[in-house]
């Protein structure tokens, strides 16, 4: 049942799904409605989220006026607005400064602590260090799957960058014909 699945899964695309021509609160109302939340649930969740993100004074501003980091944090918060069991994040921290990246990961940790399973795709190997388990793909194939610590140990590496470099360097590239 598609409607049941929608209640269990969240998704944040690399290109934001926020509507730039709507205000922050209008976006929250819109997505809350899509997720099937009642008006009361939307209002309660909106107040909680605006407080958490420190956006109470910005709620009537158009999304297009927000800095990139705020848009990313808002987009993530909307993807878990309905308390899904699983959320998929596609390159969630691309293009933001290191402080905003760290703040974003704090939001991810908070969601995981509340029981949401979080899948993250990233090209930042330092972010892989923040994960409980890491799957490294090279040329579209899974080359490694384990905890960051176990992967570093297996590949005798001091960082996830070194693990990835070793895997990518040793990959058998298919030739173009």
Residue locations for each model-derived region?
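Conserved ABC ATPase "signature" region
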Residues: 29, 33, 40-58
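Conserved ABC ATPase signature
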Residues: 62-69
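Catalytic Walker B motif of ABC-type/P-loop ATPase nucleotide-binding domains
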Residues: 87-91
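Helical segment within the ABC ATPase nucleotide-binding domain
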Residues: 102-114
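ABC ATPase "signature
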Residues: 145-146
């Amino acid at each position: 049942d598609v409607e049941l699945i929608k209640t269990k899964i969240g998704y944040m695309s690399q290109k934001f799904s926020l509507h730039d021509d709507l205000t922050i609160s209008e976006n929250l109302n819109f997505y809350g409605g899509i997720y099937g939340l009642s008006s009361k649930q939307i209002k309660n969740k909106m107040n909680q989220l605006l407080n958490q993100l420190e956006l109470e004074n910005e709620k009537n501003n158009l999304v297009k006026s927000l800095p990139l980091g705020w848009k990313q944090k808002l987009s993530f918060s909307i993807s878990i607005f309905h308390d899904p069991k699983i959320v998929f994040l596609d390159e969630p921290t691309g293009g933001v400064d290191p402080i905003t990246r760290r703040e974003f990961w704090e939001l991810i940790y908070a969601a995981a602590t509340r029981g949401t399973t979080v899948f993250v795709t990233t090209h930042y190997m330092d972010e892989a260090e923040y994960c409980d388990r890491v799957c490294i793909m090279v040329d579209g194939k899974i080359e490694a799957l384990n905890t960051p610590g176990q992967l570093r140990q297996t590949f005798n590496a001091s960082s996830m960058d070194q693990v990835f470099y070793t895997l990518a360097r040793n990959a058998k590239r298919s030739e173009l014909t």
